[in-house]
From Swiss-Prot:
HAMAP family: UPF0435. This is UPF0435 protein BC_0449. Belongs to the UPF0435 family. Pfam families: DUF1128.
Length: 74
């Protein structure tokens, strides 16, 4: 998958991968359709960060979740 291309499919792929990697408890609240496509690069940065790490502390997971929240359409 070429994540350098801004598309709905790529947004969905990254959101699902982040949810799976972080084993998010409230994953249902984070839907790919809720994300603002204008923030694609920010989502990609978060995705890259999450994918290169093996484990996360609780505070890191909270910070990532909060950052994802800023990318959701208002």
């Amino acid at each position: 998958m070429d994540l350098s291309v801004k598309s709905e499919e790529n947004v969905e792929y990254m959101v699902e991968a982040i949810k799976e990697k972080l084993r998010m408890v409230n994953a249902g609240a984070m839907r790919a359709a809720s994300f603002n496509e204008e923030m694609y690069e920010d989502l990609r940065d978060i995705y890259d960060h999450v994918m290169k790490r093996e484990t996360f502390s609780i505070s890191e997971m909270q910070a990532i979740t909060e950052e994802l929240g800023t990318l959701i359409k208002k």
